Amino acid sequence: MAKADYNKRKPRKFGKGARRCIRCGQYGPIIRIQGLMLCRHCFREVAPKLGFRKYE
């Protein structure tokens, strides 16, 4: 095997590295409600525009 073969990675199918935020590209805490695919930071910024309300 050549050295170039070691640098290729197969795409992840599960885990934190499998999904990324469609707004900022961050991996990690992803909100997938109704297919949003937003990280929690972006979700907090965009949630009122999407119609989500915060109840006390």
Swiss-Prot record:
Which cofactors does it use? Zn(2+)
Record flagged with keyword Cell inner membrane:
no
Q: What domain of life?
A: Archaea
Q: Pfam families this protein is in?
A: Ribosomal_S14
Q: Which amino acids does the record list as binding Zn(2+)?
A: 21, 24, 39, 42
Gene Ontology molecular functions: rRNA binding; structural constituent of ribosome; zinc ion binding
The alphabetized UniProt keywords are:
Metal-binding, Ribonucleoprotein, Ribosomal protein, RNA-binding, rRNA-binding, Zinc
Q: Which GO terms describe its biological process?
A: cytoplasmic translation
Q: How is the cofactor bound?
A: Binds 1 zinc ion per subunit.
Of the GO CC terms on this record, one is: cytosolic small ribosomal subunit
Q: InterPro entries attached here?
A: Ribosomal_uS14, Ribosomal_uS14_arc, Ribosomal_uS14_CS, RIbosomal_uS14_euk_arc, Ribosomal_uS14_sf
The protein's role, per its UniProt record: Binds 16S rRNA, required for the assembly of 30S particles.
Subunit description: Part of the 30S ribosomal subunit.
Q: Which family does it belong to?
A: Belongs to the universal ribosomal protein uS14 family. Zinc-binding uS14 subfamily.
Cross-referenced HAMAP family, in alphabetical order? Ribosomal_uS14_2_A
In Swiss-Prot or TrEMBL terms, this protein is called: Small ribosomal subunit protein uS14
Protein's organism: Pyrococcus furiosus (strain ATCC 43587 / DSM 3638 / JCM 8422 / Vc1)
